Design a protein with these regions (language model features):
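Short pre-active-site segment immediately N-terminal to redox-active cysteine/selenocysteine motifs
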Residues: 61-63, 67-71, 137
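Active-site acidic short loop of glycosyltransferases
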Residues: 58-61, 91, 118-119, 135
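Core hydrophobic alpha-helical membrane-spanning segments
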Residues: 5-16
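Thiol-based oxidoreductase modules, predominantly thioredoxin-like and allied folds used
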Residues: 93-106, 118-127
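Conserved redox-active cysteine motifs that mediate thiol-disulfide chemistry
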Residues: 67-84
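Thiol/disulfide oxidoreductase modules built on the thioredoxin-like
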Residues: 111-119, 124-170
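N-terminal "domain-start" segment that seeds a small globular fold
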Residues: 23-56
């Protein structure tokens, strides 16, 4: 019993550290790490019927790629913000895509999506690719240019994230 309490306490202390918000803008901030993503690598995604979705199919759109998990409270809190961005910018060539990781099988995730009224595309990710995608905490959100270059990466959630992401989208739309 004491071991369980120690593990729970350690996990509670680790969550704020692991989900601390940071942003990186590859357009304005010099690279400080060789592990930093510069563009979206080919990733294995699936729709909820098990059909593969190729990441190169996102080219030509400004993409907000949000990596999340069903058990992640900050991820769930961001759903309304992502819905609003899809609603506001979807017809202007912006695509919001949620990629669920570490959340079980599609049959487990589908009811979660309906319950949380996710109005943007949600795909199943490959948990083994989290390292390749530099997903170190949930949520991790990438704003990608039309040629799938990383414009900005957000780790965690902050009160400013919605406004900053919207400003990113507007900059990319203005750039053409």
């Amino acid at each position: 019993m004491k071991v369980v309490l120690i593990i729970v306490a350690a996990a509670a202390l680790a969550v704020p550290v692991l989900s601390r918000p940071t942003t990186q803008n590859s357009g304005n901030v010099p690279s400080t790490s060789s592990s930093e993503l510069k563009s979206l690598p080919p990733v294995n995604l699936q729709d909820f019927e098990g059909k593969p979705v190729q990441s190169d199919g996102f080219k030509g759109k400004i993409v907000v790629l949000d990596f999340w998990a069903t058990w992640c409270v900050p991820c769930i809190a961001e759903v309304p913000m992502l819905n609003k961005l899809q609603e506001k910018y979807g017809d202007q060539g912006v695509k919001i895509i949620g990629v669920t990781l570490a959340s079980g099988e599609a049959k487990d995730v589908k009811p979660f999506i309906a319950r949380n009224k996710m109005k943007y595309t949600v795909l199943m990710g490959d948990d083994d690719q989290t390292y390749d995608l530099n997903v170190v905490a949930f949520p991790t959100t990438y704003v990608l240019t039309r040629d799938l270059k990383v414009f900005r990466r957000y780790i965690g959630s902050t009160p400013r994230k919605a406004a900053e992401m919207e400003a990113d989208i507007q900059k990319l739309l203005a750039a053409g």
